[in-house]
């Protein structure tokens, strides 16, 4: 399980250090794709396979299902950790998530998310303001 929040910088070549705490769970190769809320989702291979199966079961006749599957898979790439614990994030993914230099790497149970620090701070400010309401809204889902 992934949890915690870590701040790291992207270097001039687009490389980001993967927190040591997450490396073991992710393995040497894992999938990075466009996520929701302007961040990147990072999945270990086995978790990606489960997500892929679920998405493949969506009815291709529905326009919204096709659009989501295209969005999700077109942005996906396999990344490999180098000897210094870094990954090279492709330019298209850095642009999508507005990643420039300062980033926040967050553990979210079965996946890791990569955020620009500015977007993460903005998201957290909104979420904190409505945290109690969010909790009330989802309590029935638990």
Curated annotation (Swiss-Prot):
CDD domains in the record, alphabetically? Answer: MraZ_C (cd16321), MraZ_N (cd16320)
Recall the GO molecular function terms of this protein's record: DNA-binding transcription factor activity; transcription cis-regulatory region binding
Choose any GO biological process term that the UniProt entry carries and state it: negative regulation of DNA-templated transcription initiation
- Principal subcellular localization: cytoplasm
Task: List where in the cell it is found.
Answer: Cytoplasm, Nucleoid
Q: Which residues form the SpoVT-AbrB domain?
A: 5-47, 76-119
Give the record's keywords alphabetically. Cytoplasm, DNA-binding, Repeat, Transcription, Transcription regulation
What the entry lists under Pfam families is as follows:
MraZ
Mark the transmembrane ranges: none
GO CC annotation: what is one?
A: cytoplasm
**Entries under InterPro entries matching the protein:** MraZ, MraZ_C, MraZ_dom, MraZ_N, MraZ_sf, SpoVT-AbrB_dom, SpoVT-AbrB_sf
Q: Write down the PANTHER family for this protein, in alphabetical order.
A: TRANSCRIPTIONAL REGULATOR MRAZ (PTHR34701:SF1)
Quaternary assembly: Forms oligomers.
Q: Which HAMAP family match?
A: MraZ
Describe the family membership recorded for this protein in Swiss-Prot or TrEMBL. Answer: Belongs to the MraZ family.
Q: What is this protein called?
A: Transcriptional regulator MraZ
Which species does this protein come from?
A: Desulforamulus reducens (strain ATCC BAA-1160 / DSM 100696 / MI-1) (Desulfotomaculum reducens)
Q: Which gene name belongs to this protein?
A: mraZ
């Amino acid at each position: 399980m992934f949890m915690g929040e870590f701040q790291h910088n992207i270097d001039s070549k687009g490389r980001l250090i993967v927190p040591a705490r997450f490396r073991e769970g992710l393995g040497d190769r894992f999938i990075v794709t466009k996520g929701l809320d302007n961040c990147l989702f990072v999945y270990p291979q086995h978790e990606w396979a489960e997500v892929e199966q679920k998405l493949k079961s969506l009815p291709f006749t529905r326009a919204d299902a096709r659009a989501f599957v295209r969005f999700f898979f077109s942005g996906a790439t396999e990344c490999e950790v180098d000897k210094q614990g870094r990954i090279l994030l492709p330019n298209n993914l850095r642009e999508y998530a507005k990643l420039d230099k300062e980033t926040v790497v967050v553990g979210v149970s079965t996946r890791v998310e990569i955020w620009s620090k500015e977007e993460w701070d903005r998201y957290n400010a909104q979420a904190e303001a409505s945290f109690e309401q969010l909790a009330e809204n989802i309590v029935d889902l638990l």
